[in-house]
Amino acid sequence: KALPTAVLYRAMPNTPASIGCGMTALTADNDADTTFVEALFNAVGEVAVVSEADLDRLGALSGAGPGYMFVILDALADAGVRIGLPRQLAIKAAAQTMYGAGKMALESGIHPAILRDQVTSPGGTTIAGIGAMEKGGLRSALQDGVVACLARSNELGK
């Protein structure tokens, strides 16, 4: 009321913004022009202008996403150690693989399932590993984690 012409912007960058690789969800009230605010956040990564409802959804996916990725990275590194690799090499290999796969998905525009199919051979090693991960519930655990994050965000927002 004190500032009737003021526009409220809400932004949710994630922690990779600190190295210029962030993902920021941005919303503004009253369909305001977001050009200037988008430019600010583009300096630290990518920006998605979304509705208020989608801001919380994107927060559950990409705002909290680095935490999920670090758990996956740590698990992959532990797997590398389990099969005999030195820890630092396992961490580097897992991190570079995650980085490369993410970059490949972004730059190619190809659906992740197709990219996955391109690296799996019938009866091969990759599909054996994916099968074991699927049997262990990896896919549903990741989905359930994002849903739980959104539910908690909604609770905190009340």
PLM feature segments, named:
Residues A64-Y68, K92-A93, Q118-S121:
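A generic short alpha-helical patch detector that favors 3-5-residue windows
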Residues A2-T15:
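Rossmann-fold dehydrogenase core element
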Residues R10-M12, T27, T120:
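Short beta-strand segments
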Residues A95-K158:
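NAD(P)-dependent Rossmann-like dehydrogenase/reductase catalytic/cofactor-binding core
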Residues P4-V7, M23-L58, M69-E107, L150-R152:
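Internal alpha-helical scaffold of NAD(P)-dependent oxidoreductase catalytic cores
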Residues L8-Y9, L55-A60, P112-D117:
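Short pre-catalytic strand/loop immediately N-terminal to key active-site residues, enriched for Gly-Thr
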Residues M12-C21, G59-M69:
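Glycine/serine-rich anion-binding loops at beta->alpha junctions
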